[in-house]
Amino acid sequence: MYKRQVRFFNTVGPRQVGHYGMVVPRFVSAALKNEPLSVYGSGDQIRCFCHVDDAARALLLVMDSDKAVGEVFNIGNNQQVSIMELAKKVIELTGSSSTIEKIAYEKAYPEGFEDMQRRVPDISKIKQVLGWLPEINLDQIIKDIAAFNSK
């Protein structure tokens, strides 16, 4: 058997909805309606977002390469952004008049909730073994989601 394993990190893109807490489509949707963008906690949490097209390209490389047999790869983008910076960027790129509303964790989540402060994938292995790197930056991801949602 020719097994390969991947771990996806915050894959986003057009057609994705924010119903399950996905922050990028949720922010874009709110910004397009000029509604407030809700940032939980301090907004200092660090995340990275990978365009679905980049993730699909990586997955095809993993499936097609004999070098990937028996290996585990992280698929994601390591361009870091704080949630607060993301909110500001979404407002800017969509031309929105939205405001940013900070909400304390205690008001949004049950007692004992702990948010991961930094989630950044190590993609050095997939780069080294298969030569893959993400090509689509965060600005373009936001623009793609906004364009799709504006249809």
Language model segments and positions:
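Glycine/proline-rich active-site loop of Rossmann-fold NAD(P)-dependent oxidoreductases
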Residues: 11-25, 35, 40-44, 52-53, ...
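Amphipathic terminal alpha-helices
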Residues: 125, 137-151
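Conserved small/polar residues in nucleotide/adenosyl-binding loops
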Residues: 1-2
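Generic structural signal for alpha-helix termini and adjacent loop/cap motifs
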Residues: 30, 34, 62-66, 129, ...
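Short aromatic/basic micro-patch
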Residues: 5, 49, 80, 120, ...
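Conserved C-terminal active-site "lid" loop/helix of NAD(P)H-dependent oxidoreductases
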Residues: 52, 72, 106-133, 137
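Mid/C-terminal beta-alpha module of Rossmann-like enzyme folds, strongest
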Residues: 31, 65-111
